[in-house]
Amino acid sequence: MNPEYDYLFKLLLIGDSGVGKSCLLLRFADDTYTESYISTIGVDFKIRTIELDGKTIKLQIWDTAGQERGRTITSSYYRGAHGIIVVYDVTDQESYANVKQWLQEIDRYASENVNKLLVGNKSDLTTKKVVDNTTAKEFADSLGIPFLETSAKNATNVEQAFMTMAAEIKKRMGPGAASGGERPNLKIDSTPVKQAGGGCC
């Protein structure tokens, strides 16, 4: 039987409340944006199928909205994730400082070889920007993970963020990988080194 897709990737969006995770998801999955998006209670997910290098990839994207206020996202949420997008708000220094804690959550609960992507959202608010692009890029580089600034409002880099993540996962899984499931023989080429104390800015 021929499945309708070659790969199924589970992606997570994590980060502080209000950084625009749901807006990024809505922009990518439905190409919509609303100023008055009400915080999701519990877990929400959307599916979008993309084409990449001649392969059909189904992306199942989970939004952690609601629980992150107390950082009570359960370990089951991370289980089986192929990629995790850590989002902060470029106009909110605290949301950027908290990125380190989110990365620690990933180290604690996600599979060892999960792909990560750092995203600074709300890049359209140039006059309110407090987190410097260079600072965030250097931090991401030090961990060996990709970094992008996005705007869910005007769609800047939203498509690119999810496509980058899908491409990175596909590259890690290699040719002939099954659709989903853990592959213990995957080589781990960019496991981040845990940083010692201090803020990330």
UniProtKB/Swiss-Prot annotation:
Query: Disordered: where is this region?
Result: 173-201
Task: List required co-factors.
Answer: Mg(2+)
Any GO BP: protein transport
Q: Where along the sequence does the record place the motif called Switch 1?
A: 30-45
List-wise, which residues carry N-acetylmethionine? 1
Query: What superkingdom does the record give?
Result: Eukaryota
Q: What is its EC number?
A: 3.6.5.2
Keyword Transmembrane helix part of the UniProt annotation: no
- Residue ranges for motif Switch 2? 65-80
Provide the residue positions that the database annotates as binding GTP.
Answer: 17-23, 33-36, 39-40, 66, 121-122, 124, 151-153
Pfam families per UniProt: Ras
The record ties this protein, via SUPFAM superfamilies, to:
P-loop containing nucleoside triphosphate hydrolases (SSF52540)
- PTM per UniProt? Prenylated; by GGTase II, only after interaction of the substrate with Rab escort protein 1 (REP1).
**Start and end residues of each stretch annotated as Switch 2 region:** 64-83
What GO terms fall under cellular component here?
Answer: perinuclear region of cytoplasm; phagophore assembly site membrane
- Quick one: where's the S-geranylgeranyl cysteine lipidation? 200-201
Reactions the enzyme catalyzes: GTP + H2O = GDP + phosphate + H(+)
| Topological type in the membrane | Lipid-anchor
Other known facts = Rab-1B binds GTP and GDP and possesses intrinsic GTPase activity.
Q: Which PANTHER family match?
A: RAS-RELATED PROTEIN RAB
Chain's role: The small GTPases Rab are key regulators of intracellular membrane trafficking, from the formation of transport vesicles to their fusion with membranes. Rabs cycle between an inactive GDP-bound form and an active GTP-bound form that is able to recruit to membranes different set of downstream effectors directly responsible for vesicle formation, movement, tethering and fusion. Plays a role in the initial events of the autophagic vacuole development which take place at specialized regions of the endoplasmic reticulum.
The record describes its quaternary structure and partners as: Interacts with MICAL1 and MICAL2. Interacts (in GTP-bound form) with MICALCL, MICAL1 and MILCAL3. Interacts with GDI1; the interaction requires the GDP-bound state. Interacts with CHM/REP1; the interaction requires the GDP-bound form and is necessary for prenylation by GGTase II. Interacts with RabGAP TBC1D20. Interacts (in GDP-bound form) with lipid phosphatase MTMR6 (via GRAM domain); the interaction regulates MTMR6 recruitment to the endoplasmic reticulum-Golgi intermediate compartment. Interacts (in GDP-bound form) with lipid phosphatase MTMR7.
Describe the family membership recorded for this protein in Swiss-Prot or TrEMBL.
Belongs to the small GTPase superfamily. Rab family.
The molecule here is called Ras-related protein Rab-1B
Which organism does this record belong to?
Sus scrofa
Q: Which gene encodes it?
A: RAB1B
